[in-house]
Amino acid sequence: LSGAVASGVAMGATSCVPPDQSPSGRLLAQLRIIEAQADATLGVELYDTGSKMSLGLNADRRFGHCSSFKFSLAAKVLTEDARGLIDADRRVTWTKDELMFVSPFTTKRLKEGATLRELAGATQKYADNSAANVLLRELGGPAALTGFWRSIGDETSRLDRIEPALNNVPVTEIRDTSTPAAMARTVAKLVYGDVMPDAARATLKQWMADTPTGARRVRAGLPGKWPSGDKTGTSMWLGSERLYVDIGYVEPPENAPLTF
């Protein structure tokens, strides 16, 4: 874990000599420097899907999902379709009143509607807010997504509201939150585990790789040849601190995949 990550992510902290000179120690020191320089709280969990080892900073602290919950929502669609619980090719419609900001796909498809599968892809790749709300409407609401997390062993993550209210997450809020430790393992289960069949996992993984916003976050610091994918989230809710989220996977050469 530590060797693969430390060799692949440049943190620019050569002026500090951490007391722990192991790769894990150096990486953790670099993360703390980033946190201090940003004058913010940095929550990180890097999970090695091979060794099951992890390295984290504030990994058990709760942070808001912002749009990152849409990864799990898309996974829920694919999983329940594979299990015969829903038909992901069922077409649904929505009204103009249901459209909101950051809804490029649903705005374009207002007249004709879309399948649940198309909405899942749109909410993962383009963070389409209206697509997420329509899916939540069709699949049982925020509580149903929380139930999906519980069904795969995630006892931490929760969704309580829909867009845009779920982005209002003050520091003391527990609604609509997860922890880096919980989400890194949830990503591992959904992308590399046996929650869904291979074809569905391949679809989800490709959607993550095709998500353009990730190119400006964690993936921007990775070697270009390393396969990777993610889901970002951002909140600039008035009266709350800004929040930036990125969850995903990376496949370093000669190392098991890592999730974060």
Question: Model-derived features: where do they sit?
Answer:
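Mid-domain, small-residue-enriched loop/turn segments at the edges of structured enzyme/sensor domains
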Residues: 136-195
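Conserved catalytic neighborhood of penicillin-recognizing serine enzymes
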Residues: 99-135, 141-142
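Active-site SXXK
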Residues: 52, 63-94, 260
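N-terminal export signals
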Residues: 1-17
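Beta-lactamase-like hydrolase cores
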Residues: 17-62
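Active-site-proximal alpha-helical segments within enzyme catalytic domains
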Residues: 71-72, 174-209, 242-260
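Acidic helix-start/capping segments at beta-turn-to-alpha-helix junctions
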Residues: 49, 88-105, 139-140, 166, ...
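Short, Gly/Ser/Thr-enriched beta-strand-loop segments that form substrate-interacting elements
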Residues: 216-258
